[in-house]
């Protein structure tokens, strides 16, 4: 199922990129969005998560953690390249290209109003909600 930002025109969007389903930090981040979903809905804000995982992986992740928002699959990295979130990482002494945890706030007209790079999960949701009300 294809999604485009124009599908959400007229609504604010939180587009968050995360490295991988079912890893500790990514799971904590998804659960933090889940737990704050009413605050986002109260402001008519759509949450979209995106990673390089498959649709099947996302479906299991959503079911396992009861996530009330859409996770998008970017297995060919097209969207990751557009948002420049693929960065070189050092994983166990080996260099690899992976998603840098990033969040983009997008306004009702489809313009990016705020970019968070190298996101730390703790306090991130509160930061987003504060910036969405400005």
Predicted regions and their residues:
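Chalcogenol-based redox active-site neighborhoods
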Residues: 1-134
